[in-house]
Curated annotation (Swiss-Prot):
Function: Involved in the active translocation of vitamin B12 (cyanocobalamin) across the outer membrane to the periplasmic space. It derives its energy for transport by interacting with the trans-periplasmic membrane protein TonB.
Membrane topology: Multi-pass membrane protein
Entry protein name: Vitamin B12 transporter BtuB
Signal peptide: 1-20
PANTHER family with a match to the protein in the record: COLICIN I RECEPTOR-RELATED (PTHR30069:SF53), TONB-DEPENDENT OUTER MEMBRANE RECEPTOR (PTHR30069)
The gene coding this protein: btuB
Length: 614
């Protein structure tokens, strides 16, 4: 970790009087520019979620955490473990870069988009969420934003947790962190989660085979980490985790053919790193390996039957990141190397393929009086489509003490996935999707209210669409996204309020029709308070209407799904200094709604849990 005093000196954050009041570790951000900096110095909109937030919200999935955040819209085909799409500021789910401890999520390489319905929430210790373009820093996918899930734990001791709930939900978790001598720390986490689920396919003509069954989810997770401090300036770590998930779902059925309605996912990841932390220079070298095997099969025949499908991918990464204090700011530079290897049949690609990418980036941030300037540039050399460059720049002006205006522009891109390149309908001549984004924002601190209002536009060209007539993928799509985002947080006595509002006009720029499964308006509100040691929380979420396709009709038709207001209620009580009991009612008023046409949501659900620390 970079020493806090060094950071404060480097950025002279005392100039930002409205935003520099809190200097706790939770206000330091690494994801925005790939070097640690106070959140007040980040010009892009950023949200930080801590483990304490997740426990207070009593979230049982990563999707439940993310749906509370500004700009995030999630469409899911049912309940726990079912396929989901994350839309940030109206962009495609493939335009969201998901990192695990700064490393690209392995499963995104197969489909081209990250589905976090399978990732265990028990591993999440912190989330850094950046909105807007970040390809100039991270490369492909970072068009709508970046979600960095951090698993590093900083909570010595042992915690046992057990929970039960609706639909036969069960969760058992043990985590421990212990010192092994003066300079070594070990962490171990084990987690088991199970739910019988519910029948995810909605009743009525949806084009699906009627399967009146429960679609359950089972997940087993193991995590281990070892950290060692060699000296005041040198430290290192090694960690690994794996999870074994089984998901039941409803699928299309053809008479005389096996019914493929079960998913089995094995995933493991390992990484090791070495850090140097000088007074003015910081450097980190990280090497990682991940391997996933994703089966879809008929349980009557098993996952090794010829009717089953297997998506198998190995991913190798090496990252070298550096930053140096220059003037009143930092300059960062680094190299990313990645290799993805697939087996034959993965993503319906007949042959196995290797894809390599080497990226070189440069970032800089300077504070000049009342102005903060930020810029980044990156060049990627890909074994498939060659070299591609991106850049971005931002400027912030504190025109009155406590009030700042921010303007930014950035380019970003999305590389074609393996299925689009080499699948049965693939096109090896595809080019990356390209984006240009503009944003203007005001932020300030007024009468104890910390607020930000942003307006943005995103033009995406060369989008990869499937051509029904030519039966191939081509770069023929365009999207135009305009939006307004407003956020605020404040306290009134014992009450803590967090509010956000999003207006997103995401359209196909060729046909001028709305992009599917996105709400045009979203409003979110979180209220927390303590009364006589009871920690209460109320969550409100309004999701506006959205459009989707009805495939039960031929040709398929576009349907409009209405908006919905959802309420959650949580409470926690510390029975002793070691034992805490928690309860939650999700979807308090049992609203019936869909985010994917034809797929039901859970309705009202109850959970009760307890945790014991020692």
């Amino acid at each position: 970790m970079i020493k806090k005093a060094t950071l404060l000196t480097a950025f002279s954050v005392t100039a930002f009087s409205a935003w520099a009041q809190d200097t706790s570790p939770d206000t330091l951000v690494v994801t925005a520019n790939r070097f640690q900096q106070p959140r007040s110095a980040v010009l892009a909109p950023v949200t930080i979620v801590t483990r304490q937030d997740i426990e207070r919200w009593q979230s049982t999935s990563v999707n439940d955490v993310l749906r509370r955040l500004p700009g995030v819209d999630i469409a899911q085909s049912g309940g726990a473990g079912q396929n989901s799409s994350i839309f940030i500021r109206g962009t495609n789910s493939s335009h969201v870069l998901v990192l695990i401890d700064g490393v690209r999520l392995n499963l995104a390489g197969v489909s081209g988009s990250a589905d976090l319905s399978q990732f265990p929430v028990s591993l999440v210790q912190r989330i850094e969420y950046i909105r807007g373009p970040r390809s100039a820093i991270y490369g492909s996918d970072a068009i709508g934003g970046v979600v960095n899930i951090i698993t590093t734990r900083d909570n010595p001791g042992t915690e046992l947790t057990a929970g039960w709930g609706s639909n036969s939900y069960q969760n058992y978790d043990i985590s421990t962190q212990q010192q092994l001598g003066e300079n070594t720390r070990a962490t171990l986490i084990g987690d088991y989660e199970y739910t019988k689920g519910f029948d995810v396919v909605a009743k009525g003509g949806t084009g699906m085979q009627a399967q009146p069954d429960r679609d359950g989810f089972l997940s087993k997770t193991l995590y281990g980490a070892l950290e060692h401090t060699f000296s005041d300036r040198w430290s290192g770590f090694v960690r690994g985790y794996g999870y074994d998930n089984r998901t039941d779902y409803d699928a299309y059925y053809s008479p005389g053919s096996p019914l493929i309605d079960t998913r089995k996912l094995y995933s493991q990841s390992w990484d090791a790193g070495l850090r140097f932390n000088g007074e003015r220079i910081q450097s980190q070298l990280v090497s990682s390996y991940s391997h996933s095997k994703d089966y879809n099969y008929d349980p009557h025949y098993g996952r090794y039957d010829t009717s089953a499908t297997l998506d198998e991918m190995k991913q190798y990464n090496v990252q070298w990141t550096n930053s140096v204090v220059v003037g009143h700011g930092n300059v960062g530079a680094g190299v990313d190397w990645q290799k993805q290897t697939t087996t034959p049949g993965t993503g319906y690609v007949p042959e196995g393929y290797d894809q390599r990418n080497t990226g070189v980036y440069l970032t800089g941030l300077q504070q000049l009086g009342d102005f903060t300037l930020e810029a980044a540039a990156r060049s990627d050399d890909n074994s498939q489509f060659g070299r591609h460059g991106t850049w971005q720049t931002s400027a912030g002006w504190e025109f009155i003490e406590g009030y700042r205006f921010i303007a930014s522009y950035g380019t970003s891109y999305k590389a074609p996935n393996l299925g689009q390149l080499y699948g049965y309908y693939g096109n090896p001549n595809l080019n990356p999707e390209k984006s240009k984004q503009w944003e203007g924002a005001f932020e300030g601190l007024t009468a104890g209210v910390s607020w930000r209002i942003s307006g943005y536009r995103n033009d995406i060209n060369d989008m990869i669409d499937y051509d029904d007539h030519l039966q191939k993928y081509y770069n023929e799509g365009k999207a135009r996204i305009k939006g307004i985002e407003a956020t605020a947080n404040f306290d009134t006595g014992p009450l803590t309020h967090t509010v956000s509002y999003d207006y997103v006009d995401a359209r196909n720029a060729i046909t001028d029709t709305p992009l599917p499964r996105r709400s045009k308006q979203m409003a979110k509100y979180q209220l927390d308070w303590d009364v006589y040691d009871f920690d209460w929380g109320v969550t409100y979420q309004y999701l506006g209407s959205r459009y989707d396709s009805d495939y039960s009709a031929y040709p398929y038709r576009t349907v409009k799904m209405g908006g919905v207001s959802l309420w959650d209620l949580t409470v926690a009580y510390p029975v002793t200094s070691h034992l805490t009991v928690r309860g939650k009612i999700a979807n308090l008023f049992d609203k019936d709604y869909e985010t994917v046409y034809g797929y039901q949501t859970a309705g009202r659900e109850y959970t009760l849990s307890g945790s014991y620390t020692f």
